[in-house]
Regions:
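Domain-level signal for soluble alpha/beta catalytic cores
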Residues: 1-291
Length: 291
């Protein structure tokens, strides 16, 4: 895995482009709603490979492996918790096969839906879940880790503890948050990001936030608290649920790219897209950054 120092050299050279949405684009490719994304991808690998090749062609430098909910506690719903390490390793290897010229981040996410509290017993459970997933991600050859769509500081602390125990060198932390910089738990994000910096995070920021005129300001607020590279991976605006039951986004790629350029000007060093974005959004962002 990359060290924090190697990762920071990459961020110092230029703005780093991440990828866009995975789940919503896989649904467009035929993945049924409500299924286990991780197992569906292993059964239909070409759908993921096609999507990630498009991202690489658009300029993506870091691909997120499709391991979003590949922790034991989530895989248990499919009776697959015993295969946690193997599933994560296979999914990372699948993303690694897309290109030799990009980095692959092992993707972890919130486990808030699986716990009623963050007392000592539950915190230890989260750490063990993340440890098993991280082992698989490292076995598969992940270059770094990304813990994204986090909702609570305790989740980030559990990931950080697990990463340290497993010897993972480079981990980014990304929260979903309000435009004013508060988490959905009500706590202010800034001090939490500062504590993650002190704990050895490689980058911090946000994702799954609706891109709008306030997004660049959110980048500015977070930069007051940290010297780390700030990650910005918002949605393509606000979704509308269609008659097909899927979320639809009206923001165009050029509109999104304009906002991302402003986020870059406010100091964001890692730019990508979340729900509702695709390779066209990444390509438009790349063009906006180079004009």
């Amino acid at each position: 895995m990359l060290t924090r120092q190697e990762f920071h050299k990459l961020c110092d050279r230029s703005t780093v482009l991440l990828d866009g949405a995975t789940g919503s684009n896989l649904q467009k490719a035929g993945m049924p709603r409500g299924c286990c994304t991780e197992t569906w991808v292993l059964e239909h690998p070409e759908a993921l490979l096609c999507l990630q090749r498009e991202y690489v062609q658009a300029g993506t430098q870091i691909l997120y492996a499709p391991t979003f909910q590949a922790q034991p506690i989530a895989l248990a719903r499919q009776g697959l918790e015993g295969q946690t390490e193997a599933i994560n390793a296979k999914l990372v290897q699948l993303s690694r096969s897309v290109s030799d010229n990009v980095l692959v981040a092992g993707d972890l996410t919130t486990l808030a839906a699986f716990t009623d509290s963050f007392d000592d017993a539950n915190f230890d459970l989260l750490v063990e879940n993340y440890r098993r997933q991280i082992r698989g991600l490292m076995d598969g050859g992940a270059d770094l880790l990304i813990a994204e769509t986090l909702m609570y500081a305790e989740e980030a602390e559990a990931v950080a503890t697990a990463a340290e125990l497993e010897g993972a060198g480079c981990c980014m932390y990304s929260f979903t948050m309000q435009p004013d910089g508060s988490l959905f738990s009500g706590r202010e994000a800034g001090p939490i990001l500062k504590s993650l910096e002190e704990a050895g995070a490689a980058a911090v920021g946000f994702n799954c936030v609706a891109a709008d005129l306030s997004t660049p300001g959110l980048v500015g607020k977070l930069r007051r608290y940290t010297k780390l590279p700030v990650l910005c991976k918002p949605n393509a605006g606000v979704p509308v649920i269609g008659s097909d039951g899927l979320a639809h986004y009206d923001m165009s790629a050029p509109e999104f790219a304009k906002i991302m350029l402003q986020c870059c000007q406010m100091g964001a060093r890692l730019l990508g897209g979340c729900c509702g974005t695709d390779a066209g959004f990444i390509a438009a962002t790349r063009q906006a950054l180079t004009e």
